[in-house]
Amino acid sequence: VGFKAGVKDYKLTYYTPDYETKDTDILAAFRVTPQPGVPPEEAGAAVAAESSTGTWTTVWTDGLTNLDRYKGRCYHIEPVAGEESQFIAYVAYPLDLFEEGSVTNMFTSIVGNVFGFKALRALRLEDLRIPVAYVKTFQGPPHGIQVERDKLNKYGRPLLGCTIKPKLGLSAKNYGRAVYECLRGGLDFTKDDENVNSQPFMRWRDRFLFCAEALYKAQAETGEIKGHYLNATAGTCEEMLKRAVFARELGVPIVMHDYLTGGFTANTSLAFYCRDNGLLLHIHRAMHAVIDRQKNHGIHFRVLAKALRMSGGDHIHSGTVVGKLEGEREITLGFVDLLRDDFIEKDRSRGIYFTQDWVSLPGVLPVASGGIHVWHMPALTEIFGDDSVLQFGGGTLGHPWGNAPGAVANRVALEACVQARNEGRDLAREGNEIIREACKWSPELAAACEVWKEIKFEF
């Protein structure tokens, strides 16, 4: 008989420490926690096998294909410093294993089945290197950072946003009123909350209409281009596209999607529609913490961020470093660069396991949102730089004098920080002083500073 039946060790076939990675390979870095007694090589090889061509036993149809051409290979294993039984396993996948232009297929292959594998106690995908050949099969963001600035005619500063609260329960007319007040006060964008879709108290079409009215009114009065992220997320792809079409008919500049709950397939369709029809696309990452919060199991957010850049989105929420949600500064800045820059060098101190070349795929603006207020402005300006969107929900609507003064306070604080930075002042050291000086000529800012002077989200 030509083949030997039975179960065999994965490491015989899938652990190849002398393999030279190809420029066309997709490379993955997995944090592997093997079950007690399972050697790291076997665990790493098992990951490579289960996420590519392997199955648990030898099958005779293996003889009909060229395994060496199609198998994933675990080509390097290193222990994790400070962790007893954790290893980083590096796996190389041949490009032919993946459908072109499909983030869905890429994830189904790489993280589809292997996470339930018995030989592993836990598994986390830390990073992916997307080869140039594969990047080129994706459209990516509908427009990207530069085109967005040109469309909005806003340069040399971060953009300001605000999520309309209370997130659920307002009627469409009152919702539109809140949008108008924020935009009129000086924000660039307002935002539908991620769970505002089309509920009994406010159907999507009514909301779209009143928000468009608010936007045009604020635009006429301020002479600035304004936007409201109209959430097109829906229960079916057809309904989602219907909402995007209506937004386009209203002539608004931007729509929004929840890319993880909505799914990569729907998201990529929407991104194509947005590019074809001149709409910007704001992406919210609802559900990400389910996937990325555990340190030893799941997928790191930097991988979800890379996937979004491939699937398509012009903005994506990416933590604040300073607000109420978790995020370590260097690590956050690592994936912020992965979103914005064209070429990112490997840098383990920032969590970047591979050098990534995006070959001019448009960039994505990172959005800082969640528990931030005027006192954070110097830090945010310093950390995120100009190419970002800073979103203050409660930090605008919680202003004691109302929404418009709340918006004024944020805009004044931002302009003061940008001016100070341009004059060469050190925002990290003089931040509080810069905000205090600005308070002198903005009563709105002074009132905001008073309200939030004691708030800290430190746990």
Curated annotation (Swiss-Prot):
Q: Which GO terms describe its molecular function?
A: magnesium ion binding; monooxygenase activity; ribulose-bisphosphate carboxylase activity
Task: Name the chemical reaction catalysed here.
Answer: 2 (2R)-3-phosphoglycerate + 2 H(+) = D-ribulose 1,5-bisphosphate + CO2 + H2O; D-ribulose 1,5-bisphosphate + O2 = 2-phosphoglycolate + (2R)-3-phosphoglycerate + 2 H(+)
Q: What is its EC number?
A: 4.1.1.39
What residues bear N6-carboxylysine in this entry? 191
Requisite cofactors: Mg(2+)
Note describing how the cofactor binds:
Binds 1 Mg(2+) ion per subunit.
Q: Where is the active site?
A: 165 (proton acceptor), 284 (proton acceptor)
Q: Which of UniProt's keywords are assigned here? A: Calvin cycle, Carbon dioxide fixation, Chloroplast, Disulfide bond, Lyase, Magnesium, Metal-binding, Methylation, Monooxygenase, Oxidoreductase, Photorespiration, Photosynthesis, Plastid
Q: Where in the cell is it found?
A: Plastid, Chloroplast
Q: Answer whether the UniProt record assigns the keyword Magnesium to this protein.
A: yes
Spell out the residues of the site Transition state stabilizer: 324
An example Gene Ontology CC term for this record: chloroplast
Residue(s) carrying N6,N6,N6-trimethyllysine: 4
Report which superkingdom the organism of origin falls in. Answer: Eukaryota
Keyword Membrane assigned: no
The UniProt entry, under InterPro entries, shows: RuBisCO (IPR033966), RuBisCo_large_chain_AS (IPR020878), RuBisCO_lsu_C (IPR000685), RuBisCO_lsu_C_sf (IPR036376), RuBisCO_lsu_fd_N (IPR017443), RuBisCO_lsu_N_sf (IPR036422), RuBisCO_lsuI (IPR020888)
Name the positions where substrate binds: 113, 163, 167, 285, 317, 369
The Gene Ontology biological process terms listed for this entry are: photorespiration; reductive pentose-phosphate cycle
List other remarks. The basic functional RuBisCO is composed of a large chain homodimer in a 'head-to-tail' conformation. In form I RuBisCO this homodimer is arranged in a barrel-like tetramer with the small subunits forming a tetrameric 'cap' on each end of the 'barrel'.
Q: What is the annotated quaternary arrangement, including any partners?
A: Heterohexadecamer of 8 large chains and 8 small chains; disulfide-linked. The disulfide link is formed within the large subunit homodimers.
Q: What functional role does this protein have?
A: RuBisCO catalyzes two reactions: the carboxylation of D-ribulose 1,5-bisphosphate, the primary event in carbon dioxide fixation, as well as the oxidative fragmentation of the pentose substrate in the photorespiration process. Both reactions occur simultaneously and in competition at the same active site.
Q: Which family does it belong to?
A: Belongs to the RuBisCO large chain family. Type I subfamily.
Q: What is this protein called?
A: Ribulose bisphosphate carboxylase large chain
Task: Give the gene name.
Answer: rbcL
